[in-house]
């Protein structure tokens, strides 16, 4: 059994308050949540009985012009300019007049982009010193998983973590989130974002979302553009697919009539549209994700899938995963909307507060060093059986 009342709340209250700061990429988020103090059981307290009340979930995104990505230094400048305003807005929305009543400050320790991570941890350290509140450094992926579990009610699913910087298939075992499969090169979100740059489509609200909308407009869904399909056991590779479809898109824009895949060799008629390329890319990438996820489900004998991360908002990915689960003894797919799929401060507060309640928190500021590389399976999950 897991005791989640290991550390009592401040002021002898019957609830805990946590603030979470997320800024590992171009999204800066601040979330504030409340946990109840659990009733005592004969053995101890069970982690799944911990109901979360979301008091604030504020976010701002650094958006670049079409055709451009976001550089670490520019993203960090955005975070520095906005972090104080967003923290104040979150406190106001949560109706917290005295911040010293907060039990713990949670921040993203990694993985992520170095400069933005440093901006967030500096803000967290400052608040900790000002308010005399302990700190907890949170693994970004674990934050996604714990928020997804809480929102959807998934018990012990296979987790598909798909975002701009990560692509992993994960399952819980013996106090760790074990990685069963992952990308061998670039993440799926990075693949979609870079193709969006080639197409020079807007980055707002996100490149992947705009590719999804173009894919929906495809009028020739019966005939896919043939793309590389690279699955190696439980792992997958997407750099070759990106390079290939980038070349096709550039030939399409240049009207390279020598490319017989895009143009009729006799008449010069265009055979493929930008919408066709977006649709085929999605179908190809998502089929690879479904394959390795199903393989993990068979390995751990699970019939549930939890999709987390920014790409998890994609409706087509959810549909394909749902069809696979339906074919596997009426399995279930769990996913959240963009409030929780996309990076946010609430997920950091959730994972951090669970860690804090089991007695794990930063004892000295020297322990708050952020890292760009922080594996999901490095974290000891003390709050689960």
Curated annotation (Swiss-Prot):
Its EC number is 2.3.1.234. Gene3D superfamilies: 3.30.420.40. It catalyses: L-threonylcarbamoyladenylate + adenosine(37) in tRNA = N(6)-L-threonylcarbamoyladenosine(37) in tRNA + AMP + H(+). GO terms for cellular component: cytoplasm; EKC/KEOPS complex; nucleus. A divalent metal cation binds at residues 140, 144, 161, 343. Binds 1 divalent metal cation per subunit. GO terms for biological process: tRNA threonylcarbamoyladenosine modification. Its cofactor is a divalent metal cation. It is found in: Cytoplasm; Nucleus. The keyword Ubl conjugation does not apply. Keywords: Activator, Acyltransferase, Cytoplasm, Metal-binding, Nucleus, Transcription, Transcription regulation, Transferase, tRNA processing. It is an enzyme of class 2 (transferase). Substrate binds at residues 161-165, 193, 208, 212, 314. GO terms for molecular function: metal ion binding; N(6)-L-threonylcarbamoyladenine synthase activity. It holds the Pfam family TsaD. Component of the EKC/KEOPS complex composed of at least BUD32, CGI121, GON7, KAE1 and PCC1; the whole complex dimerizes. Component of the EKC/KEOPS complex that is required for the formation of a threonylcarbamoyl group on adenosine at position 37 (t(6)A37) in tRNAs that read codons beginning with adenine. The complex is probably involved in the transfer of the threonylcarbamoyl moiety of threonylcarbamoyl-AMP (TC-AMP) to the N6 group of A37. KAE1 likely plays a direct catalytic role in this reaction, but requires other protein(s) of the complex to fulfill this activity. The EKC/KEOPS complex also promotes both telomere uncapping and telomere elongation. This is tRNA N6-adenosine threonylcarbamoyltransferase. It comes from Kluyveromyces lactis (strain ATCC 8585 / CBS 2359 / DSM 70799 / NBRC 1267 / NRRL Y-1140 / WM37) (Yeast). The lineage of its organism: Eukaryota, Fungi, Dikarya, Ascomycota, Saccharomycotina.
């Amino acid at each position: 059994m897991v005791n989640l009342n290991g550390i009592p709340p401040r002021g002898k209250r019957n609830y805990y308050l946590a603030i979470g700061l997320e800024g590992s990429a171009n999204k800066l988020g601040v979330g504030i949540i409340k946990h109840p103090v659990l009733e005592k059981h004969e053995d101890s307290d069970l982690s799944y009985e911990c109901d979360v009340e979301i008091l604030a979930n504020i976010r701002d995104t650094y958006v670049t012009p079409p055709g451009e990505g976001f550089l670490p230094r520019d993203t960090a400048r955005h975070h520095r300019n906005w972090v104080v305003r967003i923290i104040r807005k979150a406190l106001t929305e949560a109706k917290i007049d005295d911040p010293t009543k907060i039990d713990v400050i949670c921040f993203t320790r990694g993985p992520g982009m170095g400069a933005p991570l440093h901006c967030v941890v500096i803000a967290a350290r400052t608040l900790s010193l000002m308010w005399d509140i302990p700190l907890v450094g949170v693994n970004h992926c674990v934050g996604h998983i714990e928020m997804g579990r809480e929102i959807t009610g998934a018990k012990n699913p296979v987790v598909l973590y798909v975002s701009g910087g990560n692509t992993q298939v994960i399952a819980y075992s013996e106090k760790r989130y074990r990685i069963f499969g992952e990308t061998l090169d670039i993440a799926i979100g990075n693949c979609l974002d870079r193709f969006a740059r080639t197409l020079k489509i807007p980055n707002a609200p996100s490149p992947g979302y705009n590719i999804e909308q173009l894919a929906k407009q495809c009028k020739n869904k019966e005939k896919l553009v043939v793309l590389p399909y690279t699955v190696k056991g439980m792992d997958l590779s997407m750099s070759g697919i990106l390079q290939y479809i980038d070349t096709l898109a550039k030939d399409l824009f240049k009207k390279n009539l020598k490319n017989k895949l895009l143009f009729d060799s006799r008449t010069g008629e265009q055979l493929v549209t930008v919408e066709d390329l977006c649709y085929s890319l999605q179908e190809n990438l998502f089929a690879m994700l479904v394959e390795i996820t199903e393989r993990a489900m068979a390995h751990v004998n699970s019939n549930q899938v939890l999709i987390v991360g920014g790409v998890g908002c994609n409706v087509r990915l959810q549909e394909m995963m749902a069809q696979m689960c339906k074919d596997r003894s009426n399995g279930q797919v769990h996913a959240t909307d963009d409030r929780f799929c996309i990076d946010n401060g609430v997920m950091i507060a959730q994972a951090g507060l669970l860690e804090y309640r089991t007695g794990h928190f930063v004892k000295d500021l020297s322990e708050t060093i952020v890292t760009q590389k922080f594996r999901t399976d490095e974290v000891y999950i003390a709050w689960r059986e």
